[in-house]
Amino acid sequence: MPDTVIIGLVSTSDRASGGIYPDEGIPSLKAWLAKAVRNPVRFIEALVPDEQAEIEAELKKMADSDRCDLIFTTGGTGPAPRDVTPEATLNVVEKEMPGFGEQMRQISLYYVPTAILSRQTAGIRGKCLIVNLPGRPKAIAETLGGVRGEDGGIKVHGLFSAIPYCIDLIGGPFIETDETVSKAFRPQRK
């Protein structure tokens, strides 16, 4: 039986955390991951306001106490004054992984020119990969799954193609994926 993967989901939004409207980020992430990941998954969820200290505290708790293998944040990555998720992430990680943010912007630019305003990033804390995602459900699915052509073939790989191998490299569980959703790339060993 495959290893259980512990995934933290953090939605950062003043309005959703204040009950003004329902959060859409966490349900979208859970639905996408349920299709993509074949391992048993235990989700740990948090809805927090756009307060850097609160975001940092939640990321630390999930990585250190809850022992998450992977944490996704949604929202708070734009240029608005209250968008502080990247700053919170960079304050808690030990290694920045800038390729994730670069790839997210590349994917999103296929769909909207304002993707260039995104400040998404990623990094490693202990044995946990933390990745900032957009807040909108459609953008979450696009960045994780990538860009596909009319024939269904991959034009630009999504982030999730690299995540299982990254988790391998930092000592986490072996993540198996449904290749029709997101094929995990692992280099062949000679």
Task: Give short role names for the model-derived ranges.
Residues 1-190:
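Non-catalytic beta/alpha edge segments that cap or flank active sites
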